C-alpha cells in the first residue's frame, strides 16, 4: 500500500495533525484514548462502534463535547467507511480486537486507506518538544505478558526510574503519553492484535515469551499468528530476548530486521549458556550482561523471592523481565528488589481459600491451553474447572500431558465440545461433569465491531456457583480445585476478571457455608 507523504511525515506530537481526517473504530478503552488524543491534536475525528449500551452512549457524548465530528453507534455504523467532512478518512485507527476481515476494515483495505493501531499511533506521538521521550521495552507472547510487564516496570522503578506498565492490559499507552509525569521508560504489553496493526516501533529491548496455538479465529492461521508475534523484534535497538526452550522464538530473532549492534539473549529455566539468563541451584542468574560471562554468572534473585508459588512459567517470566531491564542498564540489586516489590495481579494462580484440606485456586487468566498447562503443572490431584470459548484451538496435547493429575473435570461454557472430546480420547477414566449453561447469552465481541455487551452478571454467577458446588462434591483433603479454563470468557462473562470474580465469590460463599454448618 502506498502511504501518503503526509502520513509518512507524522512522526511526532509536533507534526501537522491538524485537519487530518481520521476514523477511529471502537469506543472502548483504547479507542476512546485514541479518539481523545487525535481530537487534542486537531484532527477531524469520527468514531464508530456497534455498541449501543448506556456506557457507549456516555463515551460518545464525552467525545462529542471535546470535539469529535461525530460518533456513530449501532451495527450499521461498522459496516461501511464513514465520511468525514464529505470525504473518506485519510487514516483509520482501529481498536486491537477488530479483525482485519471486519466489514469496515476490509473495505478500507480495498480502498487503500492506511490502518494503524493505537500502539502505532502512540509510537508516532512519543516525541514531543519540551518533554522527555520515554524508552520502550516491549513484551509479547501467548502467555505471561501481563506478569512480565508488571515485573519489568517494578524492576525499573526499583532502579529509581520513572516507569509504568502500559499497553494491552492496564493503562492505555496514549494516556501514559499524555500523563503530566514524564516517564523514563514504558514496559509495553503487546497483543498479537496490536502487533498486527503496528509498523514502525523500534524498542530498546523486546521479548516474545512463548508461542502456542491461540487466536487462530482472529488471525486466520497459526502461521499468521506467529508472523504477527514476530513483529515485536523488528527494529529492536539493543537486545532481542528469546525463550531458549522454544525454538520458534529463537527463529523469530534470527529472522528479525534489527538495528545494527542489537544482541540476541536467551532465557531458560535450566542452567544458562553464555549470553543467557537462567537458573543455577535455586538462583536466577545472568550470563549475558556481565563482563566475565564466559566462566561466571551474576546472581539476580532467588526462587524464594518469587513468593509462595514459583511455577516454572513464573520463573521464566521473571527471567525475561530481568533480561529486558539488564539490557536497559539496570543493576542486579534492582532486579531482586523489583521481584520482591511486585504484587501479582488477581486471577493468575491466585489461592482463594483452603477449607477441609482442599485448596481452591483461581487462574481465570488461563484463557488458552498453553496457559492452562502451566497452571495444571503446578498442582497434583486436581479437580479442574474448565471451558468457555475455545477460539478454534486443539486441546489434545493439554489433556494428554495432564491426564495423570486430573481427579475430575467440571466443564463450564457454551463451547465445550472440543475439550470434552479431548477428555474422552485421552482421559476416558476421569469423571466429567458438564455445568448447564442456563440462560446466559453469547457475549458480542469487538471482532464484530462492537464493545462487549450481552450476558448479565447474575447469569454468569449462577453458572459458576453450580460449577463450584459440583467441584466441592468431588474434592477431598489433599485435592486442589483449579479454575484454569483454557478458553476465553465472553460466552458467559464480560471478561476473564468477571469470570474470576464469580469463582472467588462462589468459593467464599461455599466456604462460609461449610464453616457455619461445621461441615467436614
Region locations from a protein language model:
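C-terminal helical cap/extension that packs against the catalytic core
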Residues: 59-61, 66-69, 399-479, 518-520
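Residue-level signal for inorganic ion chemistry
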Residues: 38, 92, 139, 168, ...
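Short beta-strand "acidic-cap" motif of Rossmann-like dinucleotide-binding folds
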Residues: 44-49, 164-165, 187, 266, ...
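Phosphate-binding loop of NTP-binding sites
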Residues: 13, 39-40, 79-89, 96-263, ...
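Beta-strand->loop->alpha-helix junctions that form or flank phosphate-binding loops
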Residues: 49, 72-75, 116-121, 166, ...
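Nucleotide phosphate-binding/pyrophosphate-handling subdomain across enzymes
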Residues: 6-7, 13-21, 33-41, 301-406, ...
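N-terminal leader/targeting and accessory segments in enzymes
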Residues: 1-121, 513
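Short internal beta-strands
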Residues: 43-52, 241-244, 385-386, 405-415
Amino acid at each position: 500500500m502506498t502511504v501518503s507523504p503526509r502520513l509518512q511525515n507524522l512522526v511526532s506530537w509536533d507534526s501537522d495533525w491538524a485537519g487530518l481526517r481520521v476514523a477511529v473504530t471502537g469506543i472502548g478503552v483504547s479507542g476512546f484514548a485514541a479518539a481523545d488524543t487525535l481530537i487534542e491534536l486537531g484532527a477531524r475525528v469520527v468514531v464508530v462502534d456497534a455498541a449501543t449500551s448506556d456506557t457507549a452512549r456516555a463515551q460518545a457524548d464525552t467525545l462529542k463535547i471535546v470535539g469529535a465530528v461525530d460518533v456513530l453507534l449501532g451495527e450499521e455504523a461498522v459496516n461501511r467507511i464513514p465520511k468525514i467532512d464529505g470525504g473518506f478518512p485519510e487514516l483509520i485507527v482501529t481498536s486491537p480486537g477488530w479483525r482485519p476481515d471486519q466489514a469496515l476494515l476490509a473495505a478500507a483495505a480495498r480502498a487503500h486507506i492506511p490502518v494503524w493501531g493505537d500502539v502505532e499511533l502512540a509510537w508516532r506521538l512519543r516525541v514531543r518538544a519540551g518533554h522527555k521521550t520515554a524508552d520502550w521495552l516491549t513484551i509479547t507472547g501467548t502467555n505471561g505478558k501481563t506478569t512480565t510487564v508488571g515485573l519489568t516496570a517494578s524492576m525499573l522503578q526499583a532502579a529509581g526510574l520513572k516507569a509504568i506498565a502500559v499497553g494491552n492490559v492496564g493503562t492505555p499507552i496514549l494516556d501514559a503519553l499524555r500523563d503530566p509525569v514524564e516517564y523514563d521508560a514504558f514496559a509495553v504489553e503487546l497483543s498479537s492484535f496490536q502487533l498486527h496493526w503496528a509498523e514502525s516501533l523500534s524498542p530498546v529491548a523486546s521479548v516474545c515469551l512463548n508461542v502456542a496455538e491461540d487466536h487462530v479465529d482472529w488471525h486466520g492461521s497459526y502461521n499468521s499468528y506467529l508472523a504477527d508475534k514476530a513483529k515485536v523484534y523488528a527494529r529492536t535497538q539493543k537486545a532481542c530476548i528469546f525463550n531458549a526452550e522454544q525454538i520458534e522464538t529463537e527463529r523469530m530473532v534470527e529472522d528479525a530486521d534489527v538495528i545494527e549492534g542489537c544482541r540476541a539473549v536467551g532465557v531458560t529455566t535450566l542452567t544458562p549458556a553464555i549470553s543467557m539468563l537462567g537458573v543455577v541451584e535455586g538462583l536466577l542468574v545472568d550470563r549475558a550482561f556481565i563482563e566475565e560471562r564466559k566462566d561466571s554468572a551474576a546472581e539476580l534473585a532467588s526462587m524464594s523471592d518469587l513468593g509462595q508459588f514459583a511455577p516454572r512459567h513464573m520463573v521464566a517470566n521473571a527471567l525475561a523481565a530481568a533480561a529486558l531491564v539488564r539490557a536497559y542498564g539496570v543493576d542486579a540489586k534492582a532486579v531482586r528488589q523489583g521481584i520482591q516489590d511486585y504484587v501479582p495481579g488477581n486471577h493468575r494462580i491466585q489461592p482463594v481459600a483452603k477449607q477441609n484440606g482442599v485448596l481452591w485456586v483461581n487462574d481465570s487468566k488461563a484463557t488458552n491451553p498453553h496457559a492452562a498447562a502451566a497452571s495444571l503443572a503446578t498442582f497434583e490431584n486436581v479437580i479442574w474447572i474448565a471451558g468457555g470459548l475455545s477460539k478454534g484451538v486443539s486441546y489434545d496435547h493439554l489433556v494428554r500431558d495432564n491426564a495423570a493429575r486430573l481427579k475430575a473435570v467440571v466443564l463450564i461454557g457454551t463451547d465445550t465440545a472440543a475439550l470434552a472430546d479431548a477428555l474422552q480420547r485421552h482421559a476416558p477414566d476421569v469423571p466429567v461433569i458438564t455445568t448447564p449453561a442456563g440462560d446466559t447469552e453469547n457475549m458480542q465481541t469487538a471482532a464484530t465491531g462492537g464493545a462487549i455487551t450481552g450476558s448479565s452478571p447474575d447469569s454468569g454467577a449462577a453458572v459458576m456457583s453450580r460449577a463450584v458446588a459440583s467441584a466441592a462434591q468431588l474434592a477431598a483433603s489433599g485435592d486442589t480445585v483449579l479454575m484454569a479454563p483454557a478458553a476465553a470468557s465472553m460466552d458467559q462473562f464480560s471478561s476473564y476478571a468477571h469470570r474470576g470474580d464469580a469463582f472467588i465469590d462462589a468459593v467464599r460463599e461455599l466456604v462460609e457455608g461449610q464453616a457455619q454448618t461445621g461441615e467436614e
